[in-house]
Amino acid sequence: MKLLIDADFIVYKSCAAAETEVDFGSDVILVTSNFSDALSATRRELTKIRDQFGSFTPLILFFSDTVNFRKKILPEYKGHRNRKKPCGYKRVINQLKTEFEVIIMPELEADDAMGVYATQHPGNCIVSPDKDMKQIPGKLYNLDEQFTVSKESGAAWHLIQTLAGDQTDGYGGVPGVGVKRAETIFKEKGCSWKTVLETFKEKGLTEEDALVNARLARILTADDYDFNKKQPKLWSPSSDYKVNDGSGSKVKAVGTKNK
């Protein structure tokens, strides 16, 4: 088993912590960074994760590409996240490339690259605190607990996120519908694309609105990626797509906790 690690946030956090402001007075404030501190902090975080599984467990580090395919779907996607990367960010990644296997896939965020790899090579464990990764079937360690996500619960979580949206990423879902409300809707009406469309239309939104939100919410799997063209295949559900018939407990997409 390999650990598939969302390394974006680890390196970002480590580099940000290594920054120092130097105030020269007047209008001059300079930001400096200690590369050794940033790299050491990153290594410590990776060691801490590895120690949860055994010191010889192989790691693969995933980073986001500088181009994001979701911006072609919605130009405003993550538009408010305009803060530059902290000092040393690229240099730390370049150093990590000499120490670990690093994967950056064209146009994909780290989440998507992990989703594609995990479903192409089952039996590994994704390591990420991001709730989006509950879409991907298989083992997931969220830095607190380890879960096994079923294919059905992952598919349900995708539709739940389609309705609930993600304001931090810049797509709104259905106004007034959060995760809990989405779970209730699917429990009552069945977890299906038909239910998604009905819920969007009840708020005066369109099928196109629903599809845009679903495509933004979806974490890619191997089925969603064209390996020859090296680009994602946008999710296009059939009109009768469904996860379950509304029997109840299957709707809540959390997964089974591993002992």
Regions from the PLM with identified roles:
Residues 28-30, 55-56, 79-258:
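Extended two-metal-dependent nuclease catalytic cores across DNA- and RNA-processing enzymes
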Residues 1-94:
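Domain-level signal for Mg2+-assisted phosphodiester chemistry and nucleotide/NA-binding surfaces
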Residues 1, 21, 178, 258-259:
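Intrinsic structural disorder
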